[in-house]
Amino acid sequence: MALDRDDLLDQVTDHVLEHGLIGLSLRPVAAAVGTSDRMLIYHFTSRDALVSAVVARASERAIREVAAIPGAATVRSGVNRLWAAYQDQPLSRCLDMYCQAAATGLIGREPYLSDARASNEVWAASLREYFIRCGAPQRRVARIVTLVDSALYGFHLDLTTDRPAELSRGVDDLALAAQAIATG
């Protein structure tokens, strides 16, 4: 049975989340998901378009995960709760893929740049909604998201060399700063 584009994209995204984006080649990916490289090209037109679609699909999944996190009693506890979610699957792998795309220089150039910017806007909106659920005032939530998103991304990168327990104090310091912004 032939897969439609959406099902194929889900399977390729699952494969890339498990095996990584760096060194992605069409033939091995096609074989792993039970199709041919020609079918991937038929559905996605190029390797670049496939990679862009995979990164976007992983971002969609990450956004759904953030939307499912219950609001916390305070912005501080919300930052710590979000950090805990960053360390769990599937969110951790989605963030890893974004890091890999950035590390390979994909996100900073077309055809990825426009898709990455659009995806980042939706990601930031999901974080704004989350922090509003945690009590952040509307007029300050964008500032909180800018700080927290960039910092947690950095902490996530640090997980490659540091243990979560080693980073938790820095994350809580970040959470205190975000709470201070929220309370003005």
Residue ranges of model-derived segments:
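Helix-turn-helix
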Residues: D7, Q11, H15-A49, A53
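N-terminal intrinsically disordered/low-complexity leader segments
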Residues: M1-L3
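Short secondary-structure transition hinges
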Residues: N80-R128
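Residues in soluble alpha-helical coiled-coils and helical-bundle/repeat scaffolds
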Residues: T45-A49, A53, P70, A103-E110, ...
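Solvent-exposed, amphipathic alpha-helical segments
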Residues: Q11-H19, R64-E65, M97-T104, A151-D158
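Hydrophobic/aromatic-rich alpha-helical bundle segments in the mid-to-C-terminal region
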Residues: S92, R109-A118, I132-G184
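Hydrophobic alpha-helical connector segments
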Residues: A53, R64-L95, I144-V148
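Generic helix N-cap/helix-start motif at coil->alpha-helix transitions
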Residues: S59-E60
